[in-house]
A protein has these predicted regions:
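N-terminal amphipathic/basic membrane-interacting segments and domains
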Residues: 9-384
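C-terminal motif of bacterial Sec signal peptides marking the signal peptidase cleavage site
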Residues: 4-7
Length: 384
């Protein structure tokens, strides 16, 4: 019976401890994100601290005994007594997240593949680009016009918002593609230049065709080009169209993500071609911090050529925060910093949007941070 008691208690206690520690670490990071948005607003340094290790020791002790029943010995019966103790001794190591490697990742704009990864998780392209893109460059032959994602610059900001709303409307109808541009590279070489061993190696990487008239081999290889957001399947493009788009990509940065909206497909009433330039995580925190003050977003109507937007979802702010002197009563999570409470607004018509925005911010931080070192750095160890 004693063994059974200990066996039942220990897994339950362990499960509760694992969940409690997981909640505590998640809440700590969420609060740090809110604090750093506030720091960005007040132009204070951005800084993060992480939990590098949690080591918890559990001890379970059970005992048993017996005593006479309340009727005394005359009753000839014995009352069993079972007891036990449970002790938890956690050791938590806390380390600052800093150093040149992390700083470079913090300041480096996100590459295009990060945005497409999130798009495939069904995040709203409007939310993604409002948070992650610093500007859109619309191609207006023979050059690009730049429109910055900054509410302070009214004309630029409103064009930026209209472009991302247009893409969002196409996404709402499941007509938005975000795929690598499929490319085919071709080479022609004389047959005499290839030896038998080399020919076998070529066949593993290329499709090979021999032309007996010219005695040459034509080598073809399929490769993935730059990622392109479109309102059509890029696999249906002709080789000439793919090469043309790929030539344009020579001027793009790794943090640029191009789009090509064509007239003969859904959303084609406003054909456009251009590039979004993505931000770094540090810039995202700065953007959200500025939104607390005078550089807040505001309502922008979609373009008249834009198809209907699902549920007319078009919030003024990328992520709305509540700031107060008292703890917010209905917030999912809040943090106190400099005598103010900061929380993501999770009430009202855009509660889901704001939760998605904060979840996106959390994921972007995870994409930015390196593995937290476990040894060899200054740390704080808390032993209970």
């Amino acid at each position: 019976m004693v063994g059974l008691l200990a066996g039942c208690v220990s897994p339950i206690a362990l499960n509760r401890a694992v969940i409690a520690y997981d909640d505590a670490v998640t809440d700590a990071l969420s609060q740090q994100l809110l604090i750093n948005i506030a720091r960005a607003y007040h132009r204070q340094p951005i800084h993060f601290t992480g939990v590098s290790n949690i080591a918890a020791t559990f001890s379970f002790q059970a005992n048993a005994g017996a005593m006479p029943s309340p009727g005394g010995l005359a009753g000839a019966s014995i009352m069993p007594i079972f007891g036990g103790t449970f002790a938890e001794n956690p050791t938590i190591s806390i380390v600052p997240i800093e150093g040149e490697d992390f700083t470079q990742r913090l300041l480096t704009p996100f590459p295009q593949n990060k945005l497409t990864l999130l798009l495939r998780q069904r995040y709203d392209v409007d939310l993604l680009l409002r948070m992650m893109a610093q500007e859109v460059r619309l191609f207006q032959s023979p050059h690009y016009e730049i429109y910055r994602n900054s509410p302070r610059d009214t004309a630029n900001y409103e064009m930026f918002r209209r472009v991302v709303l247009h893409l969002s409307a196409i996404q709402d109808d499941n007509k938005l593609y975000a795929e690598p541009l499929p490319l085919i590279h071709t080479w022609t070489i004389p047959a005499r230049a290839i030896e038998a061993e080399g020919f076998q190696a070529l066949q593993k990487e290329f499709s090979v065709r021999h032309d007996p008239i010219s005695n040459t081999y034509t080598l073809r290889k399929h490769t993935a080009g730059p990622i392109l957001i479109t309102n059509y399947d890029p696999a249906l493009l002709s080789d000439e169209e793919r090469d043309q788009l790929n030539d344009m990509a020579d001027d793009w940065d790794v943090s640029d993500i191009a789009f090509d909206i064509r007239a003969d497909h859904y959303g084609g009433a406003w054909p456009m071609r251009g590039v979004f330039r993505l931000r770094s995580f540090h810039s995202i925190l700065g953007f959200l911090g500025k939104a607390i003050g005078a550089d807040a977003g505001y309502h922008v109507d979609k373009d008249v050529r834009t198809p209907p937007i699902l549920n007319d979802e078009n919030p003024d702010l990328t992520m709305e925060l509540e700031i107060s002197r008292i703890p917010p009563s209905e917030a999912d999570i809040s943090v106190r910093w400099n005598d103010r409470f900061y929380a993501v607004k999770t009430t009202g018509p855009y509660a889901r949007w704001n939760r998605d925005a904060f979840q996106l911010l959390f994921l972007l931080f995870q994409m930015t941070v390196t593995d937290i070192p476990r040894v060899g750095v200054p740390s704080i160890t808390i032993a209970k």
